[in-house]
Amino acid sequence: MHSVLIGSGATNMVTKNGKAGFDLEYNLILTSVPRRLDRSPGEIKDIIRKTLEELIQDKYSDEQGCASSITYRLHSLNGKRAEFCFDISIIRKHFQVRNKCRLVWNEEQGGLVWEQIPASSKQDSKVAAIKRTGHWEKVRRRYLDRKNRRLLSQDYSQPSYAIYNETVNHVFQSIKGL
């Protein structure tokens, strides 16, 4: 297994808004899964969570609210605000499909499932077109504005990668006709 910094950290758009904290997102990529755990995604997440808790001990609070990713927050000394948080999404190459899959909560099934990740090459080509035409600063400004507003209001309902993807798509559509 290995981890990859994604989202704002990977694109140099880490958010820090006033006294609000900042966050980073990682993909934890599983290169193999023991056969006995192959069809137990919830157990895989529990094992990873327990391992992380042993490593970070009591330095971070475990946010149980997100069913898909694992989130930890480091609070200020007075405990009133988050200074830093990190989200970990669990990714693996699934045995039945060629693409990678992300561990997500499925409401209908009432549990965690492996969901195939759509090919990211389309998004990569949009980013390249935006940069090539000199509009990357629009992405930065719009993303940082949206993300900072969410941090200030402590709205963690939309993952940063979703905000980033929406922002890229919005800017790409706005320059497409130019």
Where are these regions (language model features)?
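Conserved catalytic core of two-metal-ion nucleotidyltransferases
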Residues: 42-96
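Short, low-complexity, polar/charged sequence segments that are solvent-exposed and flexible
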Residues: 22-24, 46-48, 106-110
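Short catalytic/ligand-binding loop motif for oxyanion handling, primarily in non-cytosolic enzymes
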Residues: 12-14, 36, 82, 96-98
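Active-site nucleotide-donor binding segment shared across nucleotidyl transfer reactions
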Residues: 1-24, 28-35
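Glycine-rich loops and low-complexity Gly/Arg-rich segments
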Residues: 27-31, 51-54, 111-118
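The feature captures the alpha-helical scaffold/lid subdomain characteristic of nucleotidyltransferase
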Residues: 1, 59-62, 84-85, 89-178
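Short, conserved charged micro-motifs
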Residues: 34-44
